[in-house]
């Protein structure tokens, strides 16, 4: 059994999925996941498919040094920095589909699901080496990541009963 960093508030109305040691850049995947927080499942899948087709960009907020600007991010972030991380989008999309099928097996309403928790952690770096001039050797590292997400059904709030307001009596 895999340990998640957070338990769902209602385990019977949620589905989980995670990927460990995924060979995809941590920084790009973190920005992709951050853009999907609290998004409905259908909207998130459409958004990632648009990213793969370069119709919408992922806004880069934390790891944004040297990232160019694009008009596709203007309404989502003040400085308009964004990219189209295809591999990260594909990995997260596959994980969303996995969680969706887990929800179907549990008997949840797929149209009513939203991403209640998504988190990306750094995995152990994979070391390689590159050979430089004058007999030197430099490290050539890759930065894989762990992704976990929880889909939950939206809870409809209990409707408040109408208050019967009693008019105050007039003093005689």
Swiss-Prot record:
Q: Quick one: signal sequence residues? A: none
**Gene3D superfamilies noted in UniProt:** Ribosomal protein L22/L17
Q: Name one Pfam family in it.
A: Ribosomal_L22
Q: Mind listing the GO molecular function terms for this protein?
A: structural constituent of ribosome
Q: Which InterPro entries match?
A: Ribosomal_uL22 (IPR001063), Ribosomal_uL22_CS (IPR018260), Ribosomal_uL22_euk/arc (IPR005721), Ribosomal_uL22_sf (IPR036394)
Keywords attached to this Swiss-Prot or TrEMBL record, sorted alphabetically, are: Ribonucleoprotein, Ribosomal protein
Q: Which GO terms fall under biological process for this protein?
A: cytoplasmic translation
Q: Which Gene Ontology CC terms are recorded?
A: cytosolic large ribosomal subunit
Question: What family classification does the UniProt entry report for this protein?
Answer: Belongs to the universal ribosomal protein uL22 family.
Q: What is this protein called?
A: Large ribosomal subunit protein uL22y
Q: Which organism is it from?
A: Hordeum vulgare
Output the lineage of the source organism: Eukaryota, Viridiplantae, Streptophyta, Embryophyta, Tracheophyta
């Amino acid at each position: 059994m895999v340990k998640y960093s957070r338990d769902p508030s209602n385990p019977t109305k949620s589905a989980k999925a995670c990927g460990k040691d995924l060979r995809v850049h941590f920084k790009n995947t973190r920005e992709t996941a951050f853009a999907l927080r609290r998004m409905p499942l259908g909207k998130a899948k459409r958004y990632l498919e648009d990213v793969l087709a370069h119709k919408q960009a992922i806004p880069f907020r934390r790891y944004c040094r040297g990232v160019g600007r694009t008009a596709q991010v203007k309404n989502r972030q003040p400085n308009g920095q964004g990219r189209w991380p295809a591999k990260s989008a594909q990995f997260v999309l596959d994980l969303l589909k996995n969680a969706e099928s887990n929800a179907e097996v549990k008997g949840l309403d797929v149209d009513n699901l939203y991403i209640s928790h998504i988190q990306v952690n750094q995995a152990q770096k994979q070391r390689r080496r590159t050979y430089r001039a004058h007999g030197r050797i430099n490290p050539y590292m890759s930065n894989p990541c762990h992704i976990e997400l929880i889909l939950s059904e939206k809870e409809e709030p209990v409707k408040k009963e109408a208050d019967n307001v009693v008019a105050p009596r007039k003093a005689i």
